[in-house]
Amino acid sequence: MAGFSDIIGHEQIIGHLKNAIALDKVSHAYIFNGPKLSGKMMLAEAFAMALQCEGEGTRPCLLCRSCKQAVDHNQPDIIYVSHEKPNTIGVDDIRTQINNDIVIKPYSSRYKVYIVDEAEKMNQQAQNALLKTIEEPPAYAVILLLTTNADSFLPTILSRCITPVSYTHLRAHETCADL
C-alpha cells in the first residue's frame, strides 16, 4: 500500500482528496471510475490510509500504528468488500459486509472505510441495499466504489456519491518522466 506521494499522475484527484481531508469535508461515498489498472485501488487505499492516519501534517504519514496496519492490510477500520460469485456482487454481500457492519462504530479510527472493488458487478438488488446506507450513513462511514463503468450504477447512487474525476491511463511520457 502506498501513500499519495508514491502515486504517479492523478494529481487533480489526489488534490481533491487531500483537500477534502484538510478542510474536514470528507464525503460519505465516492465513486472512483476509470479503466482497469488505472490506479483506482492504489488511490483508494492511499485515501483510506490518510483518513485513518494518526500523524500530524501530511497524511498518510506511513509511520503511525494505523498507517503500518493499513500497509499490512490489517487496519480494522478499512474493510475490503469481497464477493462469493466471480461476476456478481449480490445483495447478501452488501448486507453482510456493509449494511450489517456499518452500524458498529470504528474500532480504533475516526472513520470506517469500505472499499468495494469492481463495484459495477453489483446487481440491482445489491445497489438498492447499498442505496439505503448511502442515503443515511453514520457520520464515521466512508464508502469507496471502484468501477470501470459508473454508468452501471443506479442514477440514485450516482447522485449521492462524489466522483472526483474519471481516471485515465498515464501516457508513456508521464510515466517515463517520473521513473
PLM feature spans:
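Conserved D-loop beta-strand region of ABC ATPase nucleotide-binding domains
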Residues: 146
